[in-house]
């Protein structure tokens, strides 16, 4: 869903404050107004608009650093069609594979922002570089995601690591009020994964069918990139 802008601003501000208090080096640059997203974004992802919530988040003057749990970072607006390559494992989603923007990268997981339709504003997660068919919603909205991370810091399961200089996620399962799928950790319990997939409308893919689905998706990605380049 798309957050009320006041709710989103407050959720992001609270996360920034909590992350800084935990030890993360995050100078306060103040809030920036939302800038217009590049025209190419709509063309790359085949949508007719980009949500104000996403435009606002991308306009914030964050340092070029790993500010998110487990060393994740915010990805910039994409430059071209190669951004679609990130979506090669988005199999079984209840929305068109192309209508999502890669937003947060965690080395081994990718979080995307759904750009259109009834799932607009949701955050979905996919494994990176693995033959794993685990498409699932991480959070119903940006504000919900940042709120979970802030709660994780408060609960002591997201803490600053002196060696890496970023926030580390410890065991979040069983902690009251925390949703393990909101946190960039893997693997997750299959019972939780499958229950969330049913809840959010994802279609689980059997291991022996995953490669066939992925091959078709990769062909679609190549075709979309060719049209963008033409």
Q: Language-model segments: which ranges?
A:
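A surface-exposed partner-binding patch
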Residues: 1-113, 183, 187-190, 194-230
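Long, low-complexity, intrinsically disordered segments enriched in glycines and aromatic residues
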Residues: 60-178
């Amino acid at each position: 869903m798309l957050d009320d802008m006041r709710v989103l601003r407050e959720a992001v501000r609270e996360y920034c404050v909590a992350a800084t208090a935990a030890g993360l080096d995050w100078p306060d640059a103040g809030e920036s107004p939302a800038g217009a997203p590049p025209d190419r974004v709509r063309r790359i992802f085949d949508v007719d608009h980009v949500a104000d919530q996403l435009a606002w988040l991308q306009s914030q003057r964050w340092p070029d650093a790993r500010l998110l749990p487990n060393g994740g970072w915010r990805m910039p607006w994409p430059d071209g069609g190669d951004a679609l390559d990130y979506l090669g494992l988005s199999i079984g989603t209840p929305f068109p594979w192309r209508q999502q923007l890669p937003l947060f990268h965690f080395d081994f997981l990718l979080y995307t922002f759904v750009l259109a339709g009834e799932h607009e504003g949701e955050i979905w997660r996919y494994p990176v570089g693995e033959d794993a068919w685990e498409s699932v919603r991480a959070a119903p909205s940006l504000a919900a995601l940042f709120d979970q991370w802030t709660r994780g810091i408060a609960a002591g399961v997201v803490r600053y690591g002196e060696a890496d200089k970023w926030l580390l996620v410890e065991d979040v399962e069983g902690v009251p009020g925390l949703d393990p799928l909101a946190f960039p950790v893997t693997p997750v319990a299959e019972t939780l994964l499958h229950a969330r997939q049913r809840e959010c409308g994802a279609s689980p893919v059997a291991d022996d069918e995953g490669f066939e689905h992925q091959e078709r998706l990769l062909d679609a990605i190549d075709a979309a990139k060719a049209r963008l380049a033409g």
